[in-house]
Protein backbone atom coordinates (compact mmCIF):
# COMPACT_ATOMS: atom_id res chain seq x y z
CA UNK A 1 0.00 0.00 0.00
CA UNK A 2 1.34 3.44 -0.95
CA UNK A 3 2.17 5.94 1.75
CA UNK A 4 -0.27 8.78 2.21
CA UNK A 5 0.87 12.10 0.80
CA UNK A 6 1.53 14.54 3.63
CA UNK A 7 -0.87 17.46 3.55
CA UNK A 8 0.46 20.98 3.93
CA UNK A 9 -0.62 22.70 7.12
CA UNK A 10 -0.34 26.11 5.43
CA UNK A 11 -3.47 27.27 3.67
CA UNK A 12 -3.04 28.04 -0.01
CA UNK A 13 -1.90 31.60 -0.65
CA UNK A 14 -1.14 32.30 2.99
CA UNK A 15 2.57 31.47 3.25
CA UNK A 16 5.15 34.21 3.28
CA UNK A 17 6.85 33.18 0.02
CA UNK A 18 5.17 36.01 -1.89
CA UNK A 19 6.35 38.62 0.64
CA UNK A 20 9.29 39.63 -1.56
CA UNK A 21 6.89 40.53 -4.40
CA UNK A 22 5.77 43.64 -2.54
CA UNK A 23 7.36 46.80 -1.23
CA UNK A 24 5.69 48.16 1.90
CA UNK A 25 5.65 51.93 2.31
CA UNK A 26 5.41 53.21 5.89
CA UNK A 27 3.70 56.59 5.77
CA UNK A 28 4.63 59.45 8.07
CA UNK A 29 2.12 58.33 10.76
CA UNK A 30 3.57 54.81 10.92
CA UNK A 31 7.26 55.18 10.05
CA UNK A 32 8.63 53.38 13.08
CA UNK A 33 12.03 51.71 12.93
CA UNK A 34 10.54 48.86 14.99
CA UNK A 35 8.00 48.19 12.23
CA UNK A 36 10.58 48.57 9.47
CA UNK A 37 13.04 46.23 11.18
CA UNK A 38 10.38 43.62 12.00
CA UNK A 39 9.10 43.55 8.41
CA UNK A 40 12.63 43.36 7.01
CA UNK A 41 13.45 40.50 9.39
CA UNK A 42 10.53 38.60 7.86
CA UNK A 43 11.92 39.23 4.36
CA UNK A 44 9.86 42.24 3.29
CA UNK A 45 11.10 45.20 1.30
CA UNK A 46 10.28 48.38 3.22
CA UNK A 47 10.45 52.08 2.34
CA UNK A 48 9.78 54.96 4.71
CA UNK A 49 8.05 58.27 4.02
CA UNK A 50 10.98 60.30 5.39
CA UNK A 51 13.31 58.78 2.78
CA UNK A 52 11.21 59.98 -0.17
CA UNK A 53 9.14 63.02 0.83
CA UNK A 54 9.25 66.12 3.00
CA UNK A 55 7.69 65.67 6.43
CA UNK A 56 4.87 68.09 5.61
CA UNK A 57 4.03 66.64 2.17
CA UNK A 58 0.27 66.39 1.72
CA UNK A 59 -1.05 62.83 1.51
CA UNK A 60 -2.95 63.60 -1.70
CA UNK A 61 0.38 64.59 -3.29
CA UNK A 62 2.45 61.51 -2.39
CA UNK A 63 -0.29 58.84 -2.54
CA UNK A 64 -0.40 58.73 -6.38
CA UNK A 65 3.41 58.48 -6.54
CA UNK A 66 3.51 55.51 -4.18
CA UNK A 67 0.54 53.82 -5.85
CA UNK A 68 2.21 54.36 -9.22
CA UNK A 69 5.24 52.42 -7.97
CA UNK A 70 2.83 49.66 -6.89
CA UNK A 71 4.08 49.90 -3.32
CA UNK A 72 1.72 48.84 -0.55
CA UNK A 73 0.84 51.71 1.79
CA UNK A 74 0.88 51.05 5.54
CA UNK A 75 -0.65 53.78 7.67
CA UNK A 76 -2.57 54.38 10.86
CA UNK A 77 -4.46 57.31 9.37
CA UNK A 78 -8.06 56.62 8.53
CA UNK A 79 -7.72 58.66 5.36
CA UNK A 80 -10.29 61.35 4.70
CA UNK A 81 -12.49 60.97 1.64
CA UNK A 82 -10.09 62.95 -0.60
CA UNK A 83 -7.19 60.71 0.40
CA UNK A 84 -9.26 57.54 -0.10
CA UNK A 85 -10.26 58.82 -3.54
CA UNK A 86 -6.58 59.56 -4.32
CA UNK A 87 -5.70 55.95 -3.44
CA UNK A 88 -8.54 54.57 -5.54
CA UNK A 89 -7.90 56.88 -8.50
CA UNK A 90 -4.22 55.88 -8.51
CA UNK A 91 -5.12 52.17 -8.16
CA UNK A 92 -3.35 52.04 -4.81
CA UNK A 93 -3.36 49.40 -2.10
CA UNK A 94 -3.41 50.48 1.53
CA UNK A 95 -3.59 48.79 4.93
CA UNK A 96 -4.57 50.96 7.89
CA UNK A 97 -3.70 50.04 11.47
CA UNK A 98 -6.85 51.22 13.23
CA UNK A 99 -5.70 50.89 16.83
CA UNK A 100 -4.21 54.08 18.27
CA UNK A 101 -1.88 54.71 21.22
CA UNK A 102 0.46 51.78 20.63
CA UNK A 103 4.24 51.63 20.79
CA UNK A 104 6.22 50.91 17.65
CA UNK A 105 6.91 47.38 18.89
CA UNK A 106 3.20 46.76 19.53
CA UNK A 107 2.36 48.07 16.06
CA UNK A 108 5.07 45.87 14.54
CA UNK A 109 3.70 42.82 16.34
CA UNK A 110 0.16 43.47 15.07
CA UNK A 111 1.30 44.09 11.48
CA UNK A 112 3.59 41.05 11.42
CA UNK A 113 0.76 38.96 12.85
CA UNK A 114 -1.47 40.19 10.01
CA UNK A 115 1.04 39.53 7.20
CA UNK A 116 -0.40 36.22 6.04
CA UNK A 117 -3.87 37.72 5.75
CA UNK A 118 -2.44 40.85 4.08
CA UNK A 119 -0.60 38.70 1.52
CA UNK A 120 -3.76 36.71 0.84
CA UNK A 121 -5.54 39.99 0.08
CA UNK A 122 -2.62 41.32 -2.01
CA UNK A 123 -2.39 38.09 -4.00
CA UNK A 124 -6.14 37.80 -4.63
CA UNK A 125 -7.63 41.30 -4.65
CA UNK A 126 -7.06 43.69 -7.53
CA UNK A 127 -6.16 47.29 -6.77
CA UNK A 128 -7.49 49.65 -5.67
CA UNK A 129 -8.40 48.69 -2.13
CA UNK A 130 -8.09 49.93 1.43
CA UNK A 131 -8.10 47.44 4.31
CA UNK A 132 -8.08 47.81 8.08
CA UNK A 133 -5.72 45.94 10.40
CA UNK A 134 -7.25 45.50 13.85
CA UNK A 135 -5.42 44.97 17.17
CA UNK A 136 -6.11 41.23 16.88
CA UNK A 137 -4.23 41.26 13.51
CA UNK A 138 -7.54 40.62 11.75
CA UNK A 139 -7.64 42.35 8.35
CA UNK A 140 -10.83 43.55 6.69
CA UNK A 141 -11.21 45.25 3.30
CA UNK A 142 -13.18 48.49 3.61
CA UNK A 143 -16.13 49.03 1.27
CA UNK A 144 -15.59 51.80 -1.28
CA UNK A 145 -18.29 53.98 0.25
CA UNK A 146 -16.87 53.66 3.80
CA UNK A 147 -16.88 56.90 5.82
CA UNK A 148 -15.64 56.67 9.43
CA UNK A 149 -17.71 58.31 12.15
CA UNK A 150 -15.69 61.13 13.68
Model-derived segments and their meaning:
Residues 59, 67-85:
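Acidic, metal-binding active-site segment of PIN/NYN-like and related structure-specific nucleases
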Amino acid sequence: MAAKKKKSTTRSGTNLESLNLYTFFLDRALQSYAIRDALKAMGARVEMHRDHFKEDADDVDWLPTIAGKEWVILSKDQFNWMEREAIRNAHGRAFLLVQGSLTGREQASIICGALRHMLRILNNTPAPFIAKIHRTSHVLIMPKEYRPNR
